[in-house]
Regions:
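Positively charged, small/polar-rich N-terminal and surface patches that mediate targeting and assembly
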Residues: 2-104
Length: 104
């Protein structure tokens, strides 16, 4: 049970967005803050984590944004917003264990 009446006890899907570093360097505090700011414009609750991804056999510093939401359209909107912000060609999206590449 929760004290927040807007939260469904059944839960909601958790979506993960994966944003790889374009130049292979670690994400700067400024870049991370910009991702936080843009994400907070669309969602009130989320988690941003640093991760190490792998692309074509090479390690890639990756930001992972996790959001619980039933609004898939808004999640895809966030993928496009963050993709443009970070100059990506694609952003990875995982929903309920299924991975998709979102072209920007």
């Amino acid at each position: 049970m929760t004290d927040n009446p807007s939260v469904d006890d059944v839960g909601m899907p958790v979506h993960g967005l994966f944003i790889g570093s374009r130049n292979g360097d670690a994400w700067s505090a400024e870049e991370r803050d910009a991702v936080f700011t843009e994400t907070s414009r669309l969602f009130k609750s989320f988690t941003i984590m640093d991760a190490l991804g792998c692309y074509m056999g090479r390690p890639v510093p990756t930001l992972m944004v996790r959001v619980g939401s039933n609004d898939v359209h808004r999640i895809r909107e966030l993928a496009h917003v963050l993709g443009r912000l970070t100059k990506q060609k694609e952003v990875g999206l995982e929903t309920m264990g299924r991975f998709h590449s979102i072209r920007i």
